[in-house]
A protein has these predicted regions:
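Extracellular glycoside hydrolase catalytic/binding regions
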Residues: 3-130, 134, 144-156
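Extended, alpha-helix-rich binding/interface surfaces that flank or overlap catalytic cores
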Residues: 123-124, 128-191
Length: 191
């Protein structure tokens, strides 16, 4: 990937490993991500590396020092991770880590609760000079994102089956439902 995209200006960077979970600590995650960095840097010195913490991108013990001068510590912030509280104490350890390693922070995912919750999270991030992105930008039939695509009854048959609440759809129904979902995800059909 790095060899192919090294000179592409429209590439923002590489998210090395999304939500790693190694119960023996961050040093194992760090070692794996260091090997990934070394491979990428053989071909690409231009693009930023997004380095996620351990335990679903929340724990940074054993992750320092910084792996690269052109890197950002990436973390996730979901309500279950912070007991549905949005306040300074839930991110202070990240700010301390940022200051210790002299590398910026990036909130790569924040969980779908409510628009009010999102507002509190983005305000907290901006108050602390932390970059952030919507996760997820586009969802099916919800208000917890900037863009919502419509759902339809055929696609809902599939999701009911996946959730154990409905009969297994035929191959034809499954294909039609997934095709409908893809069509509905086009921006011209979204709210």
């Amino acid at each position: 990937i790095a060899r192919r995209y090294a000179t592409e200006r429209w590439i923002g960077g590489y998210d090395l490993l999304n939500e790693p979970v190694l119960f023996n600590g961050g040093s194992q995650v760090r070692n794996l991500q260091r090997r990934m960095r070394n491979r990428i840097r053989k071909y690409d010195l231009n693009h930023t590396l997004f380095v996620n913490g351990n335990m679903w991108s929340r724990a940074f013990e054993g992750m320092g020092p910084a792996l690269d001068q052109n890197m950002i510590w990436a973390f996730h912030y979901y309500s279950w991770m912070v007991f549905n509280r949005v306040n300074q104490s839930t991110i202070q350890y990240l700010i301390n880590f940022r200051n210790l390693t002299n590398r910026p922070l990036w909130l790569g995912e924040a969980g779908e609760n409510s628009n009010e919750w999102f507002m509190e999270v983005t305000n907290l991030m901006e108050k602390n000079d932390i970059g952030w992105a919507w996760w997820n930008y586009k969802k099916i039939g919800t208000i917890t994102g900037p863009v919502s695509s419509p759902s339809d009854s055929v696609y809902q048959q599939i999701t009911k089956y996946w959730n154990g609440d409905g009969a297994r759809p035929t191959t034809e129904i499954a294909q039609l439902g997934l095709n409908n979902m893809v069509e509905n995800l086009k921006l011209e059909h979204c709210e």
